[in-house]
Amino acid sequence: MTYNQPNNKGFYGQFGGQFVPETLMTAVKQLEEAYVDSKKDPLFQAELKELLKDYVGRENPLYYAKRLTEYAGGAKIYLKREDLNHTGAHKINNALGQVLLAKKMGKNKVIAETGAGQHGVASATAAALFGMECTIYMGEEDVKRQSLNVFRMELLGAKVHSVTDGSRVLKDAVNAALRAWVAQVEDTHYVMGSVLGPHPFPQIVRDYQAVIGQEARAQFLEKENKLPDALVACVGGGSNSMGLFYPFVNDESVAMYGVEAAGLGIDTPHHAATITKGRPGVLHGTLMDVLQDENGQMLEAFSISAGLDYPGIGPEHSYFNAVGRAKYVDITDEEALEGFKILSRTEGIIPALESSHAIAYAVKLAKELGADKSMIVCLSGRGDKDVVQVKERLEAEKEVKK
Amino acid sequence: MKTLQMTLSNKKNNFIPYIMAGDHEKGLEGLKETIQLLEQAGSSAIEIGVPFSDPVADGPVIEQAGLRALARNVSLSSILETLKTIDTKVPLVIMTYFNPVYQFGIEKFVAALEKTPVKGLIIPDLPKEHEDYIKPFINDKDICLVPLVSLTTPLSRQKELVADAEGFIYAVAINGVTGKENAYSNQLDQHLKALSSLTDVPVLTGFGISTLSDVDRFNKVSSGVIVGSKIVRDLHEGKENEVIKFIENAINF
């Protein structure tokens, strides 16, 4: 049966929905209408396609990582090179689409949340391109951890609002952005950065990121004349993974692996393994798996990678997990760091710490699958933003050893 | 007609204070005396807030109160246990985000409410589209699910929201979070009057109300007011007398 989610109420099985205050209902309904219209509007689609080609630099390569494959000693590993996009990650695919939508709706201001800063940079970039006013909400902790991205956003003309509520990370930035949206909903669009939030956001972000899987599928067919056996991508909120997975959803022979951040380990309190350790709950407008205590209070997520540091996961991922369409696995901080180093050394590609989780799992999976199999790994972003953090960590480890 | 609506329909200048359960130096032990104080001052009903880690509809005053309550290990389940022991003539209204209720179990929640003086529910992140999570369980009980109507709600939707409303209609007076002051639009009074004319269910106005002149203004164009952040702040600062005086003045306009 052809996959056909979400339903007309914005649910993926039991997950999804629109759990937002009444003040936002008109805005999410307006967004839904504008989005449906835009899909039928050839001019809109042509403008987006042209931007993706000439501005983002798509299509980006599907690269056969020969030396990484040899290192892993098993299945062939192909990398979908989202790291080569303008701004260095997959986030721009969605930011451009949503800023175009905002323009279509006559909204001249955009706001967005950001964790590591990649979605903030992508949104600020898209806003600069269209001359729109842009405010980015970022947890105070992340502002400190990612000061270079803060400077980038400011260079691009955005205002960065440091969020001092709660644990001062991504979850709190989303709270602040939602509150700001309520206060200026009539002239402002909220550029949701992942497949999260009230319907239609999870669908819109999935569809704008689906270009990843559409290209990768066609490229793989051309190179190998068959479909891959597996797809691997990291999952925080889950936008790069859903972008890769979704175009393969009806290809039953293709297995999907979403790699969650296990932080210090899933048996410690310090992880972001939402599917493994969470259960269904409502946060930020949607029903999805979340990390929460027995009373339904959200727990803090933890990961070396700021982009995976979120206690929820997109509702469609919860659905994929519930029906068994995708498998969700965990990679610790240590393993991710190893992946970061391995890809740098074997292929000369420095991956983002987020994507390093996918690399680390791909190496394990390649061995399990064996040499006659193949997989596509989403290399969702480049690692320049993480180099300083990794350097400090490795130096600290050396100190301890001395 | 359910108790909550009957109580509010019978008078003008209704005053509903909001308090955060467990935000008291004695924790939930202090809830009873706060309810008594608000009842004696002349409240029509009392809104009891359930703390939540991510209260996106609330401003900083209520968010902080919630964090203080959570730090005292207050939970929906301990609040329900406490409410069972409280005897009050004014109807209580629980204000909670949806997730604590969803985790507790909706049927179990409604069953527990029946042993308390709670007569209404306000769930700001459960819009009309999702009321079926709760409504079927309370239809034949003396509990109302109070709808919120915002300034961004178009007229056609306002009509849908009030059509089967019970208890009262919560008119959100600003586009913003609770406790945001001095932001009322000039068209607000007209909006409230028009909204009230759509229904026989009492319309009460809330969000950002902190002065007696606000109260006077909204009593003229609706059936009363809901005051949260001001009450929560005053109680936290130990200004019980100020709260009593404010309520007494508010209901005597």
UniProtKB/Swiss-Prot annotation, chain A:
The gene is trpB. Its EC number is 4.2.1.20. This is Tryptophan synthase beta chain. Belongs to the TrpB family. GO terms for molecular function: tryptophan synthase activity. Its cofactor is pyridoxal 5'-phosphate. The modification N6-(pyridoxal phosphate)lysine is found at K91. InterPro entries: Trp_synth_b_CS, Trp_synth_beta, Trp_synth_beta/beta-like, TrpB-like_PALP, TrpB-like_PALP_sf. Tetramer of two alpha and two beta chains. One of its GO terms (cellular component) is cytoplasm. Keywords: Amino-acid biosynthesis, Aromatic amino acid biosynthesis, Lyase, Pyridoxal phosphate, Tryptophan biosynthesis. The beta subunit is responsible for the synthesis of L-tryptophan from indole and L-serine. It comes from Lactococcus lactis subsp. lactis (strain IL1403). It catalyses: (1S,2R)-1-C-(indol-3-yl)glycerol 3-phosphate + L-serine = D-glyceraldehyde 3-phosphate + L-tryptophan + H2O. CDD domains: Trp-synth_B. It holds the Pfam family PALP. Pathway: Amino-acid biosynthesis; L-tryptophan biosynthesis; L-tryptophan from chorismate: step 5/5. The keyword Protease does not apply. PROSITE patterns: TRP_SYNTHASE_BETA.
Curated annotation (Swiss-Prot), chain B:
Pathway: Amino-acid biosynthesis; L-tryptophan biosynthesis; L-tryptophan from chorismate: step 5/5. This is Tryptophan synthase alpha chain. Coiled coil: none annotated. It comes from Lactococcus lactis subsp. lactis (strain IL1403) (Streptococcus lactis). Keywords: Amino-acid biosynthesis, Aromatic amino acid biosynthesis, Lyase, Tryptophan biosynthesis. Its EC number is 4.2.1.20. SUPFAM superfamilies: Ribulose-phoshate binding barrel. The active site is at E47 (proton acceptor), D58 (proton acceptor). HAMAP family: Trp_synth_alpha. NCBIfam families: trpA. One of its GO terms (cellular component) is cytosol. The alpha subunit is responsible for the aldol cleavage of indoleglycerol phosphate to indole and glyceraldehyde 3-phosphate. The keyword Lyase applies. Belongs to the TrpA family. InterPro entries: Aldolase_TIM, RibuloseP-bd_barrel, Trp_synthase_alpha_AS, Trp_synthase_suA. GO terms for molecular function: tryptophan synthase activity. Tetramer of two alpha and two beta chains.
